[in-house]
Amino acid sequence: MNLLETRRSLLEEMEIIENAIAERIQRNPELYYHYIQESSKVFPDTKLPRSSLIAENKIYKFKKVKRKRKQIILQQHEINIFLRDYQEKQQTFNKINRPEETQEDDKDLPNFERKLQQLEKELKNEDENFELDINSKKDKYALFSSSSDPSRRTNILSDRARDLDLNEIFTRDEQYGEYMELEQFHSLWLNVIKRGDCSLLQFLDILELFLDDEKYLLTPPMDRKNDRYMAFLLKLSKYVETFFFKSYALLDAAAVENLIKSDFEHSYCRGSLRSEAKGIYCPFCSRWFKTSSVFESHLVGKIHKKNESKRRNFVYSEYKLHRYLKYLNDEFSRTRSFVERKLAFTANERMAEMDILTQKYEAPAYDSTEKEGAEQVDGEQRDGQLQEEHLSGKSFDMPLGPDGLPMPYWLYKLHGLDREYRCEICSNKVYNGRRTFERHFNEERHIYHLRCLGIEPSSVFKGITKIKEAQELWKNMQGQSQLTSIAAVPPKPNPSQLKVPTELELEEEDEEGNVMSKKVYDELKKQGLV
């Protein structure tokens, strides 16, 4: 096959994969939100969309049909397969070199046209096969293409991911990443400590130490050099890491592993745990060193190198357990709550709960009664019509609540937001609700428009929305202020009419603070009473 045709075919397949991924995210935006929320935890520098765009997308997601968790995780694993195919084709594309004659004749337009005509002749008789090839590629990644009967949509997976089975990836108790199956490790932990007095909740308390950056090192449940403890942590760390990647299939596993390994090599091993009182902690030797110089000399010593070579795998697994458990903090909290509920169940309640989990686990990821495409749009249109009836011809334009979703109509009406108030001064802007309307008189917009009318804003103008009324009030205020200023000017006093204060009008104060006239004060002073 011609190299140009090979490159074109690869680009075509990559574009088909891109469209297939976009189609799934458009159908169910939760696929993207489930990924981006965890990605921002793992990679804090992730550039998130603008807050306004997130709010708009939340409304968009709100209008979509709510899908089951099993379906969300299943499609994420399917998209992960698509991404692997995409990367393979991209690598193949990059390895294919362009023909030498094309490189030499890049700027020769006649030669390029001649080669193009030659290609057209070669492909003229292959149009039908070409169309069939494109359709087969599209069907390979299309939704529901794995269904045995094309007329009945029974399996949401594509033909490419036909063999994908989530029940082979998750156990029943894990519920597709909702809970962690830690009871098996509780049994192993009892064998490690050689005691039977540690309950499952106490074991979960021990695991909570790994959510803290220091406690699992400084206050470990056992001696960190104990062989049984080391073997146990290796198994637990492996499980938590596997659980993380199968719960968040869209995260780049290589990038996450490289990030954790880089932090371990360049920060953790170099004494990331520091204390002003104790100094620097060495995780391999479990010792504190007072100063940086002492710690640096310790790193090149024989004892440290021996401990590092002997315990490196354990310390790295311990660190990975700490990091992945922090990423899975929500799942760990849900697991703990679920364990507490199970312990409070009676035998019958426990059996009923297990039956519910089994039904969810065995139920298909896709239900044939789910709305798709035009059916979903029709449902949205019906909802819109109901809202139009409620809002007297308005579209579905509810303000957002604290959760970022549109406010329910009953709450919208309860706050009086269905009532409109128009302000002519603010260019006929309409305010919904009395509270918003009252507040706008103190806002910059209203004050600015008053000043544009030549009016100095004050509380007197609160409640006035008509331009004419505001101007008339301002003129009246100006006239009254002029009259008041004239009346406030006092006449010049006549020096001959100035009144001289008498002795009775003058006041004195004794040592105790009593105030009296000067005449009375003088009399009392003569008598020695003050």
Swiss-Prot record:
Residues 504-513 have a biased composition (Acidic residues). Keywords: Metal-binding, mRNA processing, mRNA splicing, Nucleus, Repeat, Spliceosome, Zinc, Zinc-finger. One of its GO terms (molecular function) is RNA binding. GO terms for cellular component: nucleus; Prp19 complex; spliceosomal complex; U2 snRNP; U2-type prespliceosome. Signal peptide: none annotated. Present with 3920 molecules/cell in log phase SD medium. This is Pre-mRNA-splicing factor PRP9. It comes from Saccharomyces cerevisiae (strain ATCC 204508 / S288c) (Baker's yeast).
